[in-house]
């Protein structure tokens, strides 16, 4: 495995791979890798000649009161996991390499950001889109892999790739979960023992929503109520949002139809967790993510 921390070196290496006719799969991360990231790497490994993993905690996507300083970091652990899962190139730039001075140009996301996490995190997806635009130009991948746990991010990346004509295939990968259903997340380490015990209620609520839809429920209000009441009954968390919207456009719905995202975010004392489920209507089939 090659470890690179300079943009110029990374671009030269990627050009070499392209000259050799090799396909490149890219997994962008902020590090502190877990089984969810490993699933992205494994999928990329199956589908490409070269797998590139980036580990970069992007300051642009953290708000003024968010956890940039305390976001978990352990590069040696990340390096070991990357090597175990067959990563060819690990790109690990410092913030000063990615942002050597004040930005002259920044990507501003105009749609799909006024709901879900975007509503309470102004500027977050602008930061995500800006760093991904830079990374896509640096890595020049054929495919980019993202976890559906952050379905809004996947929707934003879908728009970024389409609107900026990046020659990249977006590959969404289903959420990896603990045995009790809790979505894998780097932020799970912040949970207290009691919060960790309560946290699977998020996915239980989403599964209850899916069961209600399978049973014929089509009211978005009814689904929101069901999810909210389940979480309130089984956790001490503060609910940030429960949303029912179209996917990937993230338009609000009154009546469920087409591809529907049911998404939830809650705040425990020291961690904010998100989860979602994607439903395909009118068929009873559903894709759990």
Swiss-Prot record:
(R)-pantoate binds at residues 61, 153. It catalyses: (R)-pantoate + beta-alanine + ATP = (R)-pantothenate + AMP + diphosphate + H(+). Keywords: ATP-binding, Cytoplasm, Ligase, Nucleotide-binding, Pantothenate biosynthesis. Its EC number is 6.3.2.1. One of its GO terms (biological process) is pantothenate biosynthetic process. GO terms for cellular component: cytosol. The active site is at 37 (proton donor). This is Pantothenate synthetase.
């Amino acid at each position: 495995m090659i470890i690179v921390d300079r943009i110029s070196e990374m671009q030269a290496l990627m050009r070499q791979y392209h000259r050799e006719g090799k396909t490149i799969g890219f997994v962008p991360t902020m590090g502190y890798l877990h089984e969810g990231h490993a699933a992205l790497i494994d999928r990329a490994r199956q589908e490409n000649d070269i797998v590139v993993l980036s580990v970069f905690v992007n300051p642009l996507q953290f708000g003024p009161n968010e956890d940039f300083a305390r976001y978990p970091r352990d590069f040696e652990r990340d390096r070991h996991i990357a090597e175990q899962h067959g990563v060819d190139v690990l790109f690990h730039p410092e913030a000063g390499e990615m942002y050597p001075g004040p930005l002259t140009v920044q990507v501003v996301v105009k749609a799909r950001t006024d709901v879900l996490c975007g509503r309470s995190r102004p500027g977050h997806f602008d930061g995500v889109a800006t760093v991904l635009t830079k990374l896509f130009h640096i890595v020049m991948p054929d495919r980019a892999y993202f976890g559906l746990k952050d379905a809004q991010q996947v929707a934003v990346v879908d728009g970024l790739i389409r609107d900026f004509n990046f020659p990249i295939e977006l590959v969404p990968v289903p959420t990896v979960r603990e045995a009790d259903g809790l979505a894998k997340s780097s932020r799970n380490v912040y949970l207290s023992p009691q919060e960790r015990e309560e946290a699977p209620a998020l996915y239980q609520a989403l599964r209850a929503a899916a069961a209600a839809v399978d049973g014929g429920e089509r009211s978005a209000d009814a689904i929101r109520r069901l999810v909210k009441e389940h979480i309130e009954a089984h956790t001490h968390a503060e609910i940030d949002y429960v949303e029912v919207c179209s996917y990937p456009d993230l338009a609000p719905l009154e009546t469920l139809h087409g591809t529907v995202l049911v998404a939830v975010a809650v705040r425990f004392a020291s961690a904010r967790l998100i989860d979602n489920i994607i439903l395909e209507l009118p068929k009873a089939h559903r894709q759990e993510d």
